[in-house]
Amino acid sequence: MDYKKGEHSPSSSIQILSDDATINSNYAYGEQLQSNDQYNNIQHPAPSFANPFIHEQDDSYSDILEEEPDEDAYDSPERPSSTEEFISQDESNISAGSSFMFPYNRGHPLSKRHDSIMVDEFGHEYIVEGDSIASADEAIDYDALYASWTAETKAPILAIDIENIYIELAMKFGFQWDNMRNMFDYLMVMLDSRASRMTPQEALLTLHADYIGGPQSNFKKWYFACKMDQFDLKSGVLSFISRDPSTQVPYKDMSSCEALWISRMDELSNYERIEQLALYLLCWGEANNVRFMPECLCFIYKVAYDYLISPSFKEQKNPAPKDYFLDNCITPLYNLMHDQQYEIRDQKYVRKEKDHASIIGYDDINQMFWYSKGLKALLLSDGSRIMDADVASRYFLLADIQWQRVCYKSFRESRTWLHFLHNFSRIWILHISVFWYFTVYNSPTIYTPNFHYLEGTQPARAAKWCAPALAGAVASFISFLALILEAYFVPRNNPGAQPVIPRLIFVSILIALNIVPAAFIFGFSNATQQHYRSREIVGYVHFFFSIGCVAYQSFIPLPFLLGPRFKFRSSSRKYLANSYFTNDIASLPWGRTLLSAALWITVFIAKFVESYYFLTLSVRDPIRFLQRMKPYDCYDFMIGASLCSHQPKFLLSLVYLTDLVLFFLDTYLWYMLISTMFSIAYSFYMGSAIWTPWRVIFSNLPRRIYFTLLAYKDLSTEFKPKIYVGQIWNSIMISMYREHLLSLEHLKGLLYQQVGSEYFGKQTFQSPKFFMEAAKGLNKWDAFFRRNSEAERRISFFAQSLGGKIPDAVPVPKMPSFTVLIPHYGEKILLSLREIIREQDPMSRITLLEYLKQLYPNDWDNFVQDTKLMAGDVGVEETKSDVKSEKGKKQGTVKEDLPFYCIGFKSTAPEYTLRTRIWASLRSQTLYRTASGMMNYSRALKLLYRVEQPNLLDDCDGNFERLEHQLEQMAYRKFRLCISMQRYAKFNRDEYENAEFLLRAHPELQIAYLDQDPSEDGEEPKVYATLINGFCPFENGRRLPKYRIRLSGNPILGDGKADNQNMALPFVRGEYLQLIDANQDNYIEECMKIRNVLSEFEEMDCATLTPYTKKGNARHPVAMLGAREYVFSENSGILGDVAAGKEQTFGTLFSRSLALIGGKLHYGHPDFLNTIFMTTRGGVSKAQKGLHVNEDIYAGMTALQRGGRIKHCDYFQCGKGRDLGFGTIINFTTKIGTGMGEQSLSREYFYLGTQLPFFRMLSFYYAHAGFHLNNVFIMISMQLLMLVFVNLGAMYHTVEICDYQAGAAINASLYPPGCYMLKPVLDWIRRCIISIFIVFFISFLPLVVHDLLEKGVIRAVARLCKQIFSLSPMFEVFVTQNYANSIFTNLTYGGARYIATGRGLATTRVPFSVLYSLYTGSSIYLGSRLIMMLLFGTMTVWTTHYVYFWVTMFALVICPFIYNPHQFSFVDFFVDYREFLRWLSRGNTKGHAHSWIGFCRLARTRITGVNRKVKGSPSNKLTMDMPRAGLRNVIFTEVFLPACFAFFTICAYTFMNSQPGLEDKSRAVNGFIRIWIMAALPIAISTAALLILLMFSCMLGPLLRKCSKRYGAVLAALAHAVSVFGLVFTFEALWFLEAWSFSKTVLGCIVIFAIHRLVFKLVVVFLLPREVASGENNYSWWDGHWFGRKGIPYMPIQFIREFMCKVVEMNLFAMDFILSHCILFSLTPILCIPFIDIPHSVLLFWLHPSRQIRPPIYTRKQNQLRRRTFYRYSLLFFALLCTFVAMIVVPLVLDQKLSYQFKFENSVKFFRLMQPSLGVLPNTNKNTSE
């Protein structure tokens, strides 16, 4: 009992150490695993203190402290007046015997708590209720389970009556029995949750309003949007709006119909409300994939309800057929969706080769139900319409609807970049128009007649105003294009399609009004007339009119150009559905609206000022000189001056285009800067920055715990606040100790303890030394936790987070219930012992356990001490000392302790090995870590409930078992953890045992999974959504399910995750849902904030008005609440740190500012969702295959469109794992990039981009699509600059360059005469390089600022330095290119899919061939092209700014190898080289999973597609799922862009070889023809070799195949060798023909490769049919076995096709061979540095050299084999290196020895193909400029 004032007992005790409610139970095995015999003996030793009041207790209880109360201990019922009352050492009275300090663990047998108990064959207890299997919640009566919904609480309708309603509905409608049971519990938990904080009547009323009738309910919006009220009024039967069928109202009078709706809802009886809710939930619970279509579900529910209220329902006596609802209402829709994506081939379902624009998806079907026209189109098999049928019979006619006939595409997700043009037309209008203003104003030479640079001619004022004013026409033209695209993307048969023609006419008028003044000035006014005053006035009016046009079209969304059409009138509801479901945007409060406007106004002011002065003014002089520059005396023998004379114009066009791209780039730069500043300011405003003095943070922490975490207004005043605070604080500290984050010595200084006082027989409750030191301002944290440790981070964030603005906590019984949902597919559940202590890969040098020990040395030391204490191998005195130093530990450790420090155990008993497995699993990215962390919610709730209810034990009559049961019951009422284990039924033995371990550790944990019955002959197997928990009994070794609900079929129609979540949604409980990934974590101290977090949804207050009044609350609900995340993998090396930094800045810094300005969406982990809001609007994600690969973000867009508010919580965080290896990080960025490409095609982007207000549209764009397009623009700008380098270098190398002074007069003469003024272009290039450099490195700013706020200056600077010295800028370049390539390839080829990125520790060396094949297409090819161009630019027009580009370009090529673990291990390098050569050569005579030919064919398949009609197993990695790319996209990407690249390089080459300045045209040479001949030469050589070898294979193949199986491989190797020789010979020949000019030869190689690339793309795109998946054609080519081989259809066609393929492949092989060896040679200097592997490993893993990873251990045979391989292949490698060097050196030496004269006369002998060596030939009598 609890003692009151003046009472005390000398023997009073308080519980101080607990397990479950206070401590993360990762190691509290004795309590967690009571049901598992093999684990029964595991116990975690409790820490022992040198305190006479602490003593050991048995396993069921914890240590206790005794203290006598002081008479004045509980005087103040109000808030404490000062911090001292929390941390002072006065004598606080602690109740005797109340045991209120901490709640006890679960772990008592069920038989001690329940009467009806059975035991399975394994001795596991479970509860049985009748014939059904029930968990602990169902074993007791409804009053105990739903404590707030009972007769005592005046529930308007009792649970038993609600159950009867469910039973009746299930029987008469044909719902499944388990669905009925599940949905009954679903509704009751929801009612119980609401009734806990308001009256049951209010709970029912508000719940009904949220689901059915309230102003924000989705059903009500659908009801009026599709004009269902008019259907009901016409039918004259009972409906949602009229109780009296004779009621007459005007059909189109919406206000009258709404009044009838409100009246009807208000008149409903409680029975009817329950009936409506139950029917809706039953429909929803059994709808499986139809849950993704909320309005379709509304229609089904409405039809069902019409039958419910009809007389036929009351007259129905017999139950409906089994599963009637599923088979007749849901399955036809499921079959429609399934058949849209799959077809049957060879008696198997295969995915159709259709892209999104040809697939009727979820949204297309759902959108049909938005409009009355769509409902009227629902045809039955007899041709009639369902809406014409009798209302009561419609439910039974649902199965007769011809879904295939009535459904149509409502939006075309065509794969094109034009979606960006349409969706964000306002972005392009604003930027391109302003760019036009700036650039045209600074390009006066273009519109100045008779301009001459010596005269400094200036344009007329009219022209100077009118030319920039054409920006209005540009803006209007962009709008015109966007409207044309809208007419295409939105089919005109869509009832919601807005008319386009009126807006087209309006925009056309704007275009005309902007063009006419310019035509008048420039077309109908001569140079003299342009100076007239009247023309000036026209120019002024035109200019300001254009500004108005640009501003109007920038700010006004495209659909609203002629007015806000969505704002419906009472007489028309045509666009009401669009308003409700696409544009119901919750407006921001005025303060945040002004903040958003201020942010973007600041961004654009800074951007436009910087762009004008830094970019535009710097391009003014290049434009002035290049526009009027005319090269003289340049000539080619074949094409004359047709190309070279226009070289300045080509260069100018590249300058303009590059400047435009850079103009887009710096907007994102300024957005990042200003957004970061706003986020910083808000962080200080909220008080969450570390810059608050630590003395204030920690000294105020007890006070903040009391007023923030506890419901202090409802606390008993009998106890001082310190008593409450002490329990909370001690729980957190002990939890960290149990997680081995704190040592025992540290723990002692962090706990509240009882010490003796000066009063006899009394105890004082002493504050921890930690708080006392903080109050004194002493900075002695080392005495309490290690610096930079996980404990310090968690304590620091906990203290900082409580200093901000946080809602008050409500008592636990009054808090809403919630569920954590974790989708799981193949992620590790619990690491096995084999995975921990054995190397998992032959290329790995370390075991997982060893690596984790090096990453977490202090945690491991604590774990070892704990294990030794448990095993009895350490004394008490040893536990008092702190952990020894590394040296001291080695000296003090005897042989018996070595097993502990090596593997964590000495005995192989399961209880010891399990501890090591768990220790490693809790430091890896495993499901066990996630589930264990999330179960902290249960522990926190039990703790908070026990702490805030000191009299709880008295209420239980001192029975601790009853107390524990009551705590568990409360936690179970408020929190559920559901893991959606899609594959559970197909788990192997290890996976099943691990899942079973989870259930035994946490019996209340729920697992939802897919199960199926064995298929019968001719029938598909029946699939079930199944739920189990730890209380379910076993049958045949498997747990019997609690619920088993049949589905229409396999629900995984999409990419998996969204379908998996949707399958589990009916099994979640409560009002809110937290979505968690399977690689996250949570902490006890964060879980204690859950009540504050849920208060952010603003639904805690009781309803003061009924929602069914005109004054009812119509405020937009909070749909989502974002939270921070801490990436716990940040200390795992450079790549883990970079990935963590990205996640932290986006998840915290930018999310904070985005939530303020209304741009935040849902990004999955760890966001909280409003369950009712989201489930009634399509669920928590979307699931169309490919289109919704980034499934989470669509839920955010749906919530934003449909009226939900999205907030961000900055004081709560969860742990998050991130990818740690190079490959996994790149896979993740690829998934995000391709997902962005798919998002751009979606209708969500269409609606949001075109309808959001201007400032919110900017926030939405730059937070999502703008980031990815910025990466695209960065890479485009780099490639454009390289083209500028090439074209400028070609001119710089061959002409005389003028002297240039930036401050010279505009009409200064050029010197020397005949020179070319090109230096301004070089100056402009320098500025461009600086711009790109700043854009790249500004990406580090958010992370630095984040660390400054969260960690302080020293750690922020240290982290930045570590990243820079670890070459992370190079990695950023590579990631940027990968992002750009991902979105680029996705919009060209499609094929977006969910990529399993991998969550292991990256310590394995990846073979060179794997890295090369993975990253050539995305980066290495591009990097190699750019390096060649940069090399040419460096040799011709050098500037020191190129140094940055050299680093950047090399990063694109060598990054995968730099970040490959142990890449520079000397022996491994050459062993790997052998594997690389084998990769190049194999796969030509038999299939191989990893070969160059397979890599080549896979790349080609993206364009050609796969021949699906050919039977046979696919070889290599050819996929049957990816559709063939659209020809339109392929032509743009694979033909047009390479053609542009080839054109500009050919122009540069032609000018460089046109001998400018040579007046005698008869001495011109064939430079243009030369390069085409050189490009054709290697193709001709390889073609000739192929034909010759083909004859051998066909004639001798049948004979030689019998002699040698390697006959074909030898021919293939010979052909490949010839192709390499042909390419090398071409290079040497070109070098000779260029008169040994290396710069011209490099440019020639650039052109040759550009021509090859274009030609090969043309062949693949236009000439090659589909690829044969089996690869038999390739084998037949080399071995000559064409006849009789399976898998070769239409042999003549395939023969011709294979010949073209082989010509392409031979030349690609030669380029790959040379490129790959160039990369290897570039790595050789680093390889030759002694012991380079050690510093390289330090760079990658951030491990101290003393903790370096050991070399692998091989057997003698393996060592001998490796040694032979090393000698052979190192010799071959260096021989090839010498050969490559000789190809460069030998020609130079021969040139010096032979002294060959490269004169024109000798060139004539070579048909003018040789370039004469003439040098620069300036003509002083001619000028290049006018």
From Swiss-Prot:
Keywords: Glycosyltransferase, Membrane, Phosphoprotein, Transferase, Transmembrane, Transmembrane helix. One of its GO terms (molecular function) is 1,3-beta-D-glucan synthase activity. GO terms for cellular component: 1,3-beta-D-glucan synthase complex; cell division site; cell tip; cytoplasm; fungal-type cell wall; plasma membrane; site of polarized growth. It holds the Pfam family FKS1_dom1. Its main location: membrane. It is a multi-pass membrane protein. InterPro entries: FKS1-like_dom1, FKS1-like_dom2, Glyco_trans_48_dom. Residues 59-75 have a biased composition (Acidic residues). It catalyses: [(1->3)-beta-D-glucosyl](n) + UDP-alpha-D-glucose = [(1->3)-beta-D-glucosyl](n+1) + UDP + H(+). Signal peptide: none annotated. Belongs to the glycosyltransferase 48 family. Alternate catalytic subunit of the 1,3-beta-glucan synthase (GS) complex. Synthesizes 1,3-beta-glucan, a major structural component of the yeast cell wall. Required for cell wall biosynthesis and cell elongation. This is 1,3-beta-glucan synthase component bgs3.
